């Protein structure tokens, strides 16, 4: 399975995108770095062919780095969902700047049961879900579980490497399959006032979680 464009070219395009103007702590909004997004998308396409000519859902899309990257990797269409109107406005700016016509944006809560109208609809679901703070424990697993309901094939999701054993346990409970397909380093810059360090280096896993019959 080949890539539509080279990894370095993809990363260069993604670095030029607009990001969050005012990240909102209640939504745990952090930028997905261009190098993380590029390596993830390149791996997803070259190893599994899960982007080119596929129907893709970007859950919790933010300013849309995964959505736009998926289109650059040849996705047939992308549905980009986020709960934050401001984030979707930034995504729309990015779409307009690049003259993209196959990304549909939708303002809604991905975890709302109404999302299930897309049961088994998408070929591929992409997500960089909230890690889950003390006040929002388990949201990453709820995202992953909803993603599985929306795809007929695979979910590709970024998670802290420290949660690997927990995810392995959940996958077994849910009766699906999954494995880590890339180990990445996430240089998380200080985004909110309560962050004491200028940046924090976090080990991140790119997971492929999929239905047993896919």
PLM feature spans:
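Class I S-adenosyl-L-methionine-dependent methyltransferase catalytic core
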Residues: 2-214
């Amino acid at each position: 399975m080949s890539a539509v464009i080279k990894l370095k070219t993809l990363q260069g395009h993604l670095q030029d995108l607009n990001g969050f103007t005012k990240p909102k702590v209640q939504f745990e909004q952090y930028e997905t770095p261009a190098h993380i997004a590029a390596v993830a998308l390149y791996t997803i396409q070259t190893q599994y062919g899960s982007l080119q000519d596929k129907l893709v859902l970007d859950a919790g899309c933010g300013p849309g780095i995964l959505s736009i990257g998926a289109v650059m990797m040849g996705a047939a269409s992308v549905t980009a969902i986020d709960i934050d109107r401001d984030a979707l406005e930034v995504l729309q700016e990015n779409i307009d700047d690049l003259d993209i016509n196959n990304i549909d944006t939708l303002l809604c809560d991905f975890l709302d049961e109404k999302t299930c109208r897309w049961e088994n609809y998408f070929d591929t679901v992409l997500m960089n879900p909230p890690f889950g703070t003390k006040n929002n424990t388990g949201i990453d697993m709820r995202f992953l579980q909803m993603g599985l309901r929306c795809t007929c094939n695979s979910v590709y999701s970024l998670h802290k490497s420290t949660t690997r054993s927990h995810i392995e346990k959940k996958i077994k409970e849910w009766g699906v399959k999954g494995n880590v397909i890339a180990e990445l380093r996430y240089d998380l810059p200080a985004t909110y006032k309560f962050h004491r360090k200028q940046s924090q280096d976090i080990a991140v896993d790119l997971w492929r979680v999929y239905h047993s019959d896919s």
